[in-house]
Regions:
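Pre-Walker A (Motif I) flank of P-loop NTPase domains
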Residues: 41-43
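The Walker A (P-loop) glycine that initiates the GxxxxGKT/S ATP-binding motif of P-loop NTPases
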Residues: 47-48, 175
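Walker A (P-loop) phosphate-binding loop of P-loop NTPases
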Residues: 51
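Short catalytic-loop micro-motif centered on adjacent basic/acidic residues
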Residues: 171-175, 268-270
Length: 327
């Protein structure tokens, strides 16, 4: 994405340059760590549109302690995540603690975020640099799945996930929304997986996405998030209809992609239902993982509910944009 971000959201070019250097240095080590076996654990892929509650869901999954996940620390090793996983355990895992030398690494994962960005070494990260390392997308964040199989190094992609799970000895949960339009690609690569489609009331989803544009880019006229296949047509509409169409088409793509996915590998989570009764989502996911051959040996022990933000939208422009796509 090439949009000009406001100062608090701008990339740190010095950091990115140094990370590229470090990851290049580590690659020869990483290459020797790539396993040849299939993943020993299932993956949990979080799908759906922007501002649908996906960050809350990934933070919640992280807080269960039952899943490994890309952290802000691990994300810095996007070309060497197996090595990064080992380093993370060394620095932050209580098993390797010595007189609290590095205790500040072990801060609990909060439920705070800003436009999907979290704070803290062990907070969930969206892992987009890792995904983009493999995905040969251009101006539009999409290619037909047949082209992905031709161009993506799928052997290394699968091996990286397999190796990370070997290190953590847990399933991995993470956002995979960059592949909302290529669920069949992931489904074919990972025999053991659960796809969670995050959905939200469209009106509040539209309002939240518009606010994210304003917060990160300075106004609502600039496109925010992945450029989906419908971007050329949507970009000609007013901002409210752009966002309404963006959310409509992403949800449609995910629904169509999941249509051919086996029942035990998919579930839909509505943000409002999740906030009202997260334990029900935990139980459903537990059953899906069991059907994938993995039993979560734990009972639910987190919050009974979360506060729902933006429970009513009255802005006539948002309502009109919603009707243009949803009827």
């Amino acid at each position: 994405m090439t949009e000009k971000r406001l100062q608090p959201f701008q990339r740190n070019k010095s950091l990115e340059s140094f990370l590229a250097e470090v990851n290049a240095d580590l690659w020869h080590v990483e290459e020797s760590l790539l396993p040849a076996h299939k993943p020993a654990f299932p993956l949990v892929f979080v799908m759906g549109p922007l501002r649908s509650g996906s960050t809350l869901l990934t933070q919640w999954l992280a807080n269960t302690g039952l899943f490994a996940y890309p952290t802000n620390l691990l994300s810095r090793f996007y070309r060497a995540p197996i090595m990064g996983a080992k380093l993370q355990l060394l620095l932050a895992d209580e098993r390797y603690n010595f007189r609290d030398e590095l205790k500040d690494f072990g801060q609990p994962v909060s439920f705070d975020s800003e436009n999907g960005k979290t704070k803290g070494a062990l907070a969930p990260n969206e892992f987009w640099y890792f995904w983009r390392r493999f995905l040969p997308f251009g101006d539009i964040d999409y290619l037909p799945t047949s082209e992905l199989f031709d161009q993506v190094n799928t052997k290394t992609l699968v091996a990286e996930f397999s190796g990370m799970m070997d290190v953590f000895n847990k399933p991995i949960s993470l956002k995979a929304m960059i592949l909302n339009y290529n669920i069949d690609f992931l489904d074919a690569l990972f025999e053991k997986a659960v796809f969670i489609h995050c959905k939200r009331d469209p009106l509040t989803n539209i309002e939240s996405a518009l606010n994210a544009r304003k917060r990160q880019l300075g106004d609502i006229d600039k496109w925010y998030s992945f450029k989906i296949p419908e971007y050329p047509e949507l970009s000609r509409l007013d901002p409210h209809e752009q966002v309404a169409g963006q959310i409509f088409h992403v949800n449609k793509a995910v629904e169509e992609g999941l249509r051919n996915v086996a029942e035990h590998k998919k579930m839909t989570v509505r943000y409002e239902d999740f906030c009202d009764h997260p334990e029900a989502v935990f139980d459903q996911l537990k059953n899906k993982l069991s059907a994938n051959g993995y039993d979560l040996d734990a009972e639910y022990c987190l919050a009974e509910r979360f506060n729902v933000t933006r429970d009513k939208v009255t802005d006539p422009k948002i309502v009109s944009a919603y009707r243009a796509f949803y009827g």
